[in-house]
């Protein structure tokens, strides 16, 4: 299973029909396939090894796809053209109306779909997207072509709060969650110290009674 990247996106367009198209796709089959579709030939080929008997045919299909689309399979296409390997959608959290656009909240596999944002931006969409991947400790803000990316591995909660933009930090509770982890870790270390002290005291008492 992949690490999941949390995303919060505001998306706007001057054409209301394009906004409705986003809503329908996001709440339905998937947003990225609607606007940046994976060619059918790439979707119908295995991204990986195949049985020996099928290798020759598989290689021919891969070469055809590479020459035609620039990619041999759906996985390579999605990672490069979308920025993530799977499509994104509501998954129980439908698009919300905001003045002039929509607010989208979703998880994406391993990374935010910034490559897709670039293509949507070229179609006339205005996009401000915040993302947060706790497993690899990175977060950022993609704002109409500019990507402010932050890595916070090894930082304290205080350092994170000082480094990340306030809106980004508060949107996902990043420094707050790290502060909770720090408090839990400190409590565990304190309990270990108490146990060790208790063990030493018991040993000393036994020695004195001999």
Model-derived features with residue positions:
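Long, contiguous binding/interaction regions
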Residues: 1-209
């Amino acid at each position: 299973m992949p690490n999941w990247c949390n995303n919060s996106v505001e998306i706007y367009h001057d054409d209301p029909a394009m906004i409705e198209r986003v809503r329908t796709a996001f709440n339905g089959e998937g947003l990225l396939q609607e606007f940046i579709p994976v060619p059918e030939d790439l979707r119908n080929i295995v991204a990986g090894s195949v049985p020996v008997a099928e290798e020759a045919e598989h290689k021919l299909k891969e070469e055809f796809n590479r020459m035609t689309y620039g990619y041999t399979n759906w996985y390579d296409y999605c990672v490069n053209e979308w920025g993530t390997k799977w499509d994104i959608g509501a998954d129980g959290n439908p698009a919300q109306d905001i003045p002039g656009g929509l607010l989208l909240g979703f998880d994406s596999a391993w990374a935010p779909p910034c490559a897709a944002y670039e293509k949507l931006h070229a179609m006339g969409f205005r996009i401000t997207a915040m993302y947060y991947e706790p497993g690899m400790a990175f977060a950022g803000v993609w704002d109409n072509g500019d990507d402010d990316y932050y890595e916070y591995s090894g930082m304290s909660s205080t350092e994170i709060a000082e480094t990340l933009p306030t809106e980004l930090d508060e949107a996902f509770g990043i420094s707050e969650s790290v502060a909770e982890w720090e408090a839990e870790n400190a409590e565990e270390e304190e309990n270990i110290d108490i146990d060790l002290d208790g063990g030493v005291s018991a040993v000393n008492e036994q020695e004195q009674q001999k």
